[in-house]
Every structure is written in structure tokens, then in C-alpha cells.
Design a protein with these regions (language model features):
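An acidic-aromatic substrate-binding cleft motif
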Residues: 31-126
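Well-ordered alpha-helical scaffold segments within catalytic/enzyme domains
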Residues: 95-114, 158-172, 188-189, 198-217
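Extended acidic/polar, glycine-enriched regions
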Residues: 8-46
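Short, small-residue-biased leader/transition segments that mark boundaries at the very start
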Residues: 2-7, 229-234
Length: 237
């Protein structure tokens, strides 16, 4: 007998408008088990709330000029911003993701106070250009103050994505050009032999094509394809 004759699939649809954890007790064929379900709000609602929290609580407006406009880690227990030279607590690196999220949320019209969020993003964009990136060369630094004492290629995909999202939001060509220069710098620094997480080559090529930037499109495509050629194993006859 096949498994289909022994086990009959049963489906149960669980719906609840209230968020939170729910525990279901399941009994089938005298077998008992427990299932825990976490009901969350819709992704767009969560994204909007996250963006509002970033704008209201995670942007620096204090006395330190170097950090003006930065999105920083936030201590929910102490209710304070946190910034230290340590990699996971500085003003660079994965904090870029907060800027990416707000730019995408603005593109999708998810935010109630659009004007406030866009002003916040403008301030973060200015911080990014001033403290983390050399827009002329494409260099991406690990920490504010153009501090690149800790070299990290993983910062480049984040930066390319951020400037691409700003380009898509505002249509300002310099953001697209900056994304190209960062990509070129990534490969210049041995990015050919480095496997990055989420290097947005396809999105960059699509946006360059839309913008009619054929020369930059060819440059980016050639750089990416050269990575494939380098990665090919050597064949012996």
C-alpha cells in the first residue's frame, strides 16, 4: 500500500485578526501534538511602523557633528541611541539597511507622514555622502568619519543598494552614478574573488538601461561577467 492509502492529508485554516501567539492542540489518529502560531500584522503595516520608529527614535540629532543624520542602534530598555567603534554598533555597515527600508517604503507610499520620513532620509543621505562614502571614487568606509581602518567588502552591496533606492525614489542621476562608481570600486578591490550577499547587479543594470546609460551598463555587465570567467574551473585535456 502506498503512503497515500495510509495517511490522508487534512487541512485546517486558522485565522485571527488579533496579533500574538496562539497554541493549538492537535489530535489525529490518537496522536497528540502542539502547534504554536505567531500572528503578525501585514508586512506593509510592519514596515510602516518600523520606518516610523527609525525616524522618531534612531536618527541622531545631537551635538556630535560627525553623526548628524545617522541612523543608529537603539537601546529599548535604556531608551537611548547607541554608537561605539565596534563593528555592529557603529554608524555604518548594516545600519544602511534602515535607509534602504525607508526609501522603499516611500516608493510604495506606505508611510503616513511622508514629508517627515523623506526629510529624515534626506538627512541620512547627506550623512552617508559626508561620512561613509567617497562619491567621486566609490570608496565605502566601515565607519563614520570616513574611517576605513577595518576593510570590509560587504559594505559595498549595501551602499550600492542604498543609492539605487534613492535614485528610484528621487530620480536624481547622481545617485545612479554613485552606485556605478561603488560597483567599480568593489571589483577594483578584488571583488572578483569575493562572494557578497545581495550585490544588486541585476537591479543596477535594469536601472541603467531605463536611464539610457549604455556606457555604464556595459561597464557593470562586463565587470560582473568577468567574475564568472574567473570562477570557471580550469579544464585539462
Amino acid at each position: 500500500r502506498g503512503l497515500g492509502d495510509v495517511y490522508k492529508r487534512q487541512e485546517y485554516l486558522f485565522e485571527n485578526e488579533k496579533t500574538g501567539e496562539y497554541v493549538l492542540s492537535i489530535c489525529a489518529d490518537e496522536v497528540k501534538t502542539t502547534c504554536r502560531l505567531l500572528v503578525q500584522e501585514r508586512p506593509e503595516t510592519l514596515a510602516a511602523k518600523r520606518c516610523a520608529f527609525i525616524v522618531d527614535h534612531q536618527q541622531y540629532h545631537g551635538k556630535i557633528k560627525e553623526l548628524q543624520g545617522a541612523y543608529l542602534p537603539y537601546d529599548n530598555e535604556e531608551k537611548i541611541l547607541v554608537c561605539t567603534p565596534e563593528n555592529d554598533f557603529n554608524a555604518g555597515r548594516e545600519r544602511t539597511g534602515m535607509g534602504v527600508l525607508i526609501a522603499r517604503a516611500l516608493q510604495q507610499n506606505l508611510l503616513k507622514d511622508r514629508e517627515k520620513a523623506e526629510q529624515s532620509l534626506r538627512e541620512y543621505h547627506a550623512f552617508y555622502l559626508r561620512e561613509l562614502v567617497n562619491a567621486a571614487t566609490g570608496l565605502v568606509c566601515n565607519c563614520s568619519g570616513k574611517d576605513n581602518s577595518y576593510f570590509r567588502l560587504y559594505n559595498y552591496p549595501w551602499a550600492v543598494t542604498f543609492f539605487l533606492e534613492c535614485w528610484k525614489l528621487w530620480g536624481e542621476k547622481e545617485n545612479l552614478k554613485t552606485a556605478v562608481r561603488i560597483t567599480e570600486k568593489f571589483y577594483e578591490q578584488d571583488g572578483f574573488r569575493f562572494y557578497p550577499i545581495e550585490m544588486p547587479i541585476v537591479m543596477l543594470c535594469q536601472e541603467l538601461k531605463k536611464a539610457g546609460e549604455q556606457e555604464d551598463l556595459k561597464t557593470v555587465r562586463d565587470l560582473f561577467l568577468s567574475l564568472i570567467h574567473i570562477s570557471e574551473p580550469t579544464r585539462h585535456s
